[in-house]
Every structure is written in structure tokens, then in C-alpha cells.
Amino acid sequence: MALTRRNLISATILGAAAVAAPMAQAKQKTPLKPMKVSPKRRVLIQSSSRYHNSGYLDFAGDQYEKLFGKEKYEILFIPYAKVAGTYDAYEKQVQDAFKPYGHKIVSIHRFKDPQKAVREAKAIAVGGGNTWALVTRMYEAGIIDLIRERVNAGVPYCGWRQRRLPDVAHH
């Protein structure tokens, strides 16, 4: 499958780590391993970061509690979809959103070795924004397969789109 913008659109909805590897295969020198799905997966994919007039990621509190349980995690945040602003600012926004749940957010850009960061992550969150930038940067960092392996091993994974869901009034 060609690495094109059209093929990457589904990555936002289905989770970049789950679908990006086959798309990146066109540029990879060796074939990727077939995707194996594990029943251990703990995944939450949100179609938006906001709903109606809610704050950033506010409306998903119940889902986060189901995903993470009572355990408090240090969550590895992947901000690579951010194209306007800084990774630091994006990390802070996500830290503030997860603070009420007791989780600590640390962005992958703070690590010298992003692959090691993914291998050692206890939980992973992928922020929304520009899907092309996200998948390209994940591919360049060599973390797509690693994220899939970690998710299939049962590491909690969440991701979201950047935009707000429309508020459709029923009359």
C-alpha cells in the first residue's frame, strides 16, 4: 500500500500504530511482519478531543478509568501530530487533562532514544493533529512496530483526534 495522505486518514480513526505500518511498508527496505492482534489489548480510540463545550479530553473520564483501572501510570505521550505550536505546549495541555486521574504524562520528545522509551512505556497516548506528520515522524523514529508490539502485550494505549465533535441539535 502506498504511503499517501489518503491512506493515512484511517490512521486517525483506527489508531496510527494499528494501521500505519502497512502504509509505511512501501518505503521500508524489508517487509513488515504480519499484524497479529492480541486479546490482551487495552485500547481507547477517541474520535475527538472535545465534545460539545467540554474541556480538552474532559468528556472521556469514565473511559480512561476503564482503560487504566485504579493504577496510576506514567504515560508516554506521542505528540508527533502537532504541526503548529511546540511539543512542550502540547505535552502541558495533555498533562493538565490527565492530572485529575492521577496519571503522569511524559512526552517522547524528552527522550534521547524514542525506541527505548516505547519499549519501557507502561502506557502510551498518541495525540491528534496532522495524521501525515504523526505517521511520518513515528516511522522516522522507528516506533510503529514497537507500539504495536507493546499494545498487543497489554500496555494501555489511547489516542484521539484533535478536533471537536459537532454539536448537532435535535428539534
Predicted regions located by residue number:
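Short polar catalytic/cofactor-binding loops
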Residues: 48-52
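Conserved beta-strand elements of the Class I
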Residues: 44, 74-76
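Class I SAM-dependent methyltransferase SAM-binding "motif I" and its flanking Rossmann-like core
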Residues: 135-137, 141-171
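Structural motif
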Residues: 45, 125-127, 158
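Portal/gating segments that form or line small-molecule/metal binding sites
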Residues: 82-128, 132-134, 139
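C-terminal segment of N-terminal export signals and the immediately downstream linker at the start
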Residues: 23-42
